[in-house]
Design a protein with these regions (language model features):
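Peripheral, solvent-exposed domain-edge segments
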Residues: 2-10, 14-100, 108-114, 118-132, ...
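Short glycine/proline/serine/threonine-rich loop/turn segments at secondary-structure transition edges
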Residues: 140-146
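Conserved structural position at the C-terminal beta-strand
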Residues: 149-151
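Proline-anchored loop/turn motifs at beta-strand termini and strand-loop-strand connectors
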Residues: 135-139
């Protein structure tokens, strides 16, 4: 019986490792409930997400909310306005790369402003250690913020991936952050659909990014 129990435990550990390696997830700044060493413990009532790399939805269905998890960490990483974050990813299957967006919110995900966009080339050929530099805007106000990563893959099922990290920004006291709202595509029926684009000659939906709505985030001075 002890032998069977040991085998079962080993199998569960192996399955968890394989699950984390499937697809791609944000690992730095630590995505909410990421199992990586060094990431904070989940807040009370939440648990480590061993399926952190899984998509949150497809063009036909919504599996999880934007960010994947909505309860923020109690411990946050601190970055300065104007600082460049070398974002990192747990890479399993990069699906030929695709489109990525990074955005900030100061109201826990109600309003987002995009701070970087990569068309087609994001995660193309990505392997362990893959990193993308993302700069916090120099005029970003101080305060608690949510840092979001979105990815629409080039090859495979029409999916949307999203992870969020909880950060503290040290910038000016109050102010505005202007930009565009993120494109939320391949996320349930009725959402914009970006088809597969494994070849450079195939339509990739980039025209949808040009239609993103302008948005202004206002943070009150303290």
């Amino acid at each position: 019986m002890m032998f069977k129990t040991t085998i079962l435990a080993a199998a569960m550990v192996a399955f968890s490792a394989l699950t984390v390696q499937a697809h791609v997830g944000l690992s730095f700044p630590c995505a909410r409930y990421h199992p990586a060493a060094g990431c904070p413990a989940p807040p009370a009532g939440q648990s480590i997400d061993y399926d952190i790399n899984a998509p949150i939805g497809t063009s036909d269905s919504i599996n999880r909310p934007i960010c994947k998890h909505t309860v923020p960490y109690t411990k946050r990483s601190t970055f300065k306005a104007g600082q460049t974050i070398q974002t990192k990813y747990s890479v399993g299957a990069p699906h030929g790369g695709g489109h990525c967006q990074w955005a900030l919110s100061y109201d826990n995900g109600k309003t987002w402003v995009v701070i970087k966009t990569m068309i087609r080339e994001c995660l193309r050929g990505a392997q362990a250690g893959y990193s993308v530099p993302v700069q916090i805007p120099a005029n970003a106000p101080s305060g608690k913020a949510t840092f979001m990563w979105l990815w629409n893959n080039a090859i495979g099922n029409r999916e949307l991936y999203s992870n969020c990290a909880d950060i503290e920004i040290q910038g000016k006291n109050g102010g505005q952050l202007q930009g565009v709202a993120p494109l939320i595509a391949n996320y349930g029926k009725g959402s914009p659909v970006i088809g597969e684009f494994p070849l450079a000659t195939q339509p990739d939906g980039k025209e949808l990014f040009a239609k993103r709505k302008a948005v202004t985030i206002t943070v009150k001075a303290k």
